[in-house]
Amino acid sequence: MRDRWPVPRRAGAVIRTNLEAGRRPLETFEDYVFYCDLMVNDGRHTYDGADAFREIIQHYPGTILLLNLRDREAWITSRLRHGHGEFARREMAARGLSDEAALTEAWRTDWDARLSAVRAHMADRPGQLVEFDIDKDSPADLVAALPRYGLNPEDFHDIGNSRTRRLSPLMRRLKAEIAHRRPRFFGK
């Protein structure tokens, strides 16, 4: 989701607010087909809308959950680097953790618990859980798992993959400054 769309940039905040108010999780933007980037963190509170998968399935019983997988430790490393460390700092503050080691252990626990919970909850819903390993599976595998959407594997490419990108020292510094200083408006 992007700001130019008629949906708030942080869908996770909308999901959290809706559930707190007793509404359906995706109320106000139910016409969309795909939802992602459901994490909200302002340094005081952290909420991952992906944890609302039970409520989403309850209110939208035909939903297909796409569970993106990758090596857990690579995922943690990526999160630690996200926003030049700003995301990890906000997560530590919101969780009341004092060091990166405690945060990485919390993320390991979260990862294992979510995988187990999603798989258990979806066990009796064959065809509604699609697991996609971003390191091993191809776009063609994803397209094959979602035939009714008429997807084209050529439309999928890696956006946001910075593992192999090399920036000049000036660009690295500018990106870090922007990541640490940009205003964040997440509501409560």
For each predicted feature, which ranges?
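N-terminal cationic-hydrophobic initiation segments that often serve targeting/anchoring roles
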Residues: 26, 56-58, 119-123
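A structural signal for short, well-ordered beta-strand segments and their strand-loop junctions
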Residues: 2-3, 34-37, 64-69, 130-133, ...
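PAPS-dependent sulfotransferase catalytic domain
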Residues: 50-109, 128, 140-144
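Short hydrophobic/aromatic-enriched beta-strand-loop microsegments
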Residues: 1-5, 89, 150-157
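PAPS-dependent sulfotransferases, especially Golgi type II membrane carbohydrate sulfotransferases
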Residues: 98-188
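PAPS-dependent sulfotransferase catalytic core
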Residues: 1-32, 38, 165, 171-180, ...
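Glycine-rich phosphate-binding loop used to anchor ATP phosphates in small-molecule kinases
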Residues: 28-57, 68
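Well-ordered, non-membrane alpha-helical segments in soluble/globular domains
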Residues: 19-22, 46-54, 108-116
